[in-house]
Amino acid sequence: MEYKLRRKVDDFLRHWKQNPDKMPLIIKGARQIGKTSSIKHFAESYKHFIEINFITEPQYLKIFSSGYSPENVIKEISLINPEFKFVPNETLILFDEMQACPDCATCLKFFKIDGRYDVICSGSLLGINYEEVTSVSVGFKEDYQMNSLDFEEFLWAK
């Protein structure tokens, strides 16, 4: 993937990865501002990258049906796509368009406690029905608000 534009989120993600006590990350922001592109570029620093998009791949909406533990979630993902490789401490999992799957927020606590996989969620969060969310994993996730290109980032682009 060719990536030419430096964004502030790039520095944030590098520091996040280096934190030995990192929590699952939720990157929020408006549509079409580069969230997914920035995350995919960052994912190149991992040996294994698992991308789950709940809008373009609705078959993944059921991955939380047998529970929220990493073992259950990974098992369900692997049943859908057996080619995905989940290697502890070498894998980044992206749950993209999480607003389409309210239960996604619940699993973050369990991924944090487990600690073997880095997890990033992304989405506009417009229209999410919080009444459908079992738990939002308060204290077990970190939020980052990404904005559209600002003037400093524009100057970096030259």
Residue spans for each PLM region:
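Phosphate-binding site recognition
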Residues: 1-158
